[in-house]
Amino acid sequence: MLSSALYQQAGLSGLLRASAMGPQTPFIASPKETQADPMAFVKDLLAGGTAGAISKTAVAPIERVKLLLQTQDSNPMIKSGQVPRYTGIVNCFVRVSSEQGVASFWRGNLANVVRYFPTQAFNFAFKDTIKGLFPKYSPKTDFWRFFVVNLASGGLAGAGSLLIVYPLDFARTRLAADVGSGKSREFTGLVDCLSKVVKRGGPMALYQGFGVSVQGIIVYRGAYFGLYDTAKGVLFKDERTANFFAKWAVAQAVTAGAGVLSYPFDTVRRRLMMQSGGERQYNGTIDCWRKVAQQEGMKAFFKGAWSNVLRGAGGAFVLVLYDEIKKFINPNAVSSASE
């Protein structure tokens, strides 16, 4: 990591050239780290949450288009013919802008930012805490053991944080999938969405699709963190001198790959979310998998996947931006990969 003096001398361009790879969080459970900086945990949360909030707001229009394409076969207004189907990414962008207004691209973004701050922050913060419970292996001499440790720590961190923020993720999906305009909107905002769904189906209605979400989050986060940390250890001899754009390219490939791999799980959970508090289209997770495959074909599990790849640019940006923010907050922190 750069020292405070070097940071002041180098400026932003020097920081980007000399930055360490990606989201390197400290081993918060390590006595050495916590004694050196008792605020390391708080700084971890602040850096990860800030980076996530910025990137999510930037890619919110792509996120909403992805959700509309992904859930339209479970959207009552579209299924009834009240609102015509979207035929693709471009068609969705054009119609949403003309029918609902440009500002509607950010429907559900508040819930997403509120959700994403603790989700991403806890993912990054607890990943290395969990990883600290496992033996440490070198990516050069014990590649597969190193890979498995990173895969497990990333997956467990994501699954744990999901339990806390799932109602916000649920609300984000329902708000983004609301194709009404003006008085025809189903929900007017985050609080209205949560209160109406609870009134219709009880508190557990906010956890529709949670089971398959846990499966998907383990697959996604496991690949997201595990592959990224593994790629860093294998591709970069000195992480501290890694090129900014090289970091971004690796992060982009990881987020795209992890997103496609876990996308069918995401489609199923979104479909289950859409029926909460209303008419039931599926009797459960297995029934949803079966009906989508039989009635719409396997490609239906990947509706909106291309939008998800584009949105992945924001995820890759988070991985790189996180480290830059963390170094600004805590210039003397030591990268976990360098220990």
Curated annotation (Swiss-Prot):
It is found in: Mitochondrion inner membrane. ADP:ATP antiporter that mediates import of ADP into the mitochondrial matrix for ATP synthesis, and export of ATP out to fuel the cell. Cycles between the cytoplasmic-open state (c-state) and the matrix-open state (m-state): operates by the alternating access mechanism with a single substrate-binding site intermittently exposed to either the cytosolic (c-state) or matrix (m-state) side of the inner mitochondrial membrane. It comes from Parachlorella kessleri (Green alga). Its main location: mitochondrion. Residues 269-274 are annotated as: Important for transport activity. The transmembrane helices are not perpendicular to the plane of the membrane, but cross the membrane at an angle. Odd-numbered transmembrane helices exhibit a sharp kink, due to the presence of a conserved proline residue. This is ADP,ATP carrier protein. The lineage of its organism: Eukaryota, Viridiplantae, Chlorophyta, core chlorophytes, Trebouxiophyceae. It is a multi-pass membrane protein. The keyword Repeat applies. The matrix-open state (m-state) is inhibited by the membrane-permeable bongkrekic acid (BKA). The cytoplasmic-open state (c-state) is inhibited by the membrane-impermeable toxic inhibitor carboxyatractyloside (CATR). Belongs to the mitochondrial carrier (TC 2.A.29) family. ADP binds at R115, K127, R269. It comes from the Eukaryota. GO terms for cellular component: mitochondrial inner membrane. Solcar repeats lie at residues 39-133, 145-234, 246-328. Monomer. GO terms for biological process: mitochondrial ADP transmembrane transport; mitochondrial ATP transmembrane transport. It catalyses: ADP(in) + ATP(out) = ADP(out) + ATP(in). The keyword Transmembrane applies. The chain crosses the membrane at residues 41-70, 110-134, 144-164, 212-232, 245-265, 305-322. GO terms for molecular function: ATP:ADP antiporter activity. Keywords: Antiport, Membrane, Mitochondrion, Mitochondrion inner membrane, Repeat, Transmembrane, Transmembrane helix, Transport. A motif (Nucleotide carrier signature motif) lies at residues 269-274.
